[in-house]
């Protein structure tokens, strides 16, 4: 199981490859706002853990294992953003809130949040009911 730091790298690498078709150390460093040497160290760890294949000066590719977890991490992040928006969290705080909680939730909790998002999406009146409760609580 990857550490939270490994998850951050895998998520970003997955997104870069989806967006650009590749991910270089410099791209990862820029996206995560870290020094390239830190990226190189982490990429080597991810290589040893079979999440990716890294060839110095040539780049990296995600293994099937790396792609699977990367896709799941992106799903988790997006789901949590959607959920926080849905329940009315201020958009200025959503990214930081997601970053703060995503590594601390079990996959079971993520699945239950997914169920709740689906529950609200299937019947918009449920979300309206939530808004009414929130209005009452703000008074």
From Swiss-Prot:
Regulation: DNA binding is strongly activated by Mn(2+).
Gene3D superfamilies according to UniProt: Iron dependent repressor, metal binding and dimerisation domain, Winged helix-like DNA-binding domain superfamily/Winged helix DNA-binding domain
Record's keyword annotation contains Transcription regulation: yes
Residue sites binding Mn(2+) 2 per the record: 11, 77, 99, 102
Listed Pfam families: Fe_dep_repr_C (PF02742), Fe_dep_repress (PF01325)
Keyword entries, A-Z: Activator, Cytoplasm, DNA-binding, Manganese, Metal-binding, Repressor, Transcription, Transcription regulation
GO biological process, one term: intracellular manganese ion homeostasis
An example Gene Ontology molecular-function term: DNA-binding transcription factor activity
Entry annotated with the keyword Endoplasmic reticulum: no
HTH dtxR-type domain boundaries: 1-63
InterPro entries on file: DtxR_MntR_Metal-Reg, Fe_dep_repressor, Fe_dep_repressor_sf, HTH_DTXR, HTH_tscrpt_reg_MntR, Iron_dep_repressor, WH-like_DNA-bd_sf, WH_DNA-bd_sf
Location of this chain's protein in the cell: Cytoplasm
Binding sites annotated in the UniProt record for Mn(2+) 1: 8, 99, 102-103
GO cellular component, one term: cytoplasm
Superkingdom of this protein's organism: Bacteria
Task performed by this protein: Central regulator of manganese homeostasis.
Assembly behavior: Homodimer.
Family: Belongs to the DtxR/MntR family.
Name of the protein this chain belongs to: HTH-type transcriptional regulator MntR
């Amino acid at each position: 199981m990857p550490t939270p730091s490994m998850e951050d790298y895998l998520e970003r690498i997955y997104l870069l490859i989806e967006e650009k078709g590749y991910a270089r150390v410099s791209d990862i460093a820029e996206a995560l706002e870290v020094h390239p040497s830190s990226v190189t160290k982490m990429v080597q760890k991810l290589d040893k853990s079979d999440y990716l294949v890294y060839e110095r000066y040539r780049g990296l590719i995600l293994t099937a294992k790396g792609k699977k977890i990367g896709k799941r991490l992106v799903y988790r992040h997006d789901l949590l953003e959607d959920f926080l928006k849905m329940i009315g969290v201020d958009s200025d705080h959503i990214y930081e809130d997601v970053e703060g909680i995503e590594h601390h939730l079990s996959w079971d909790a993520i699945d239950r949040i997914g169920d709740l998002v689906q529950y609200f999406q299937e019947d918009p009146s449920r979300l309206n009911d939530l808004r009414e409760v929130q209005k009452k609580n703000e008074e």
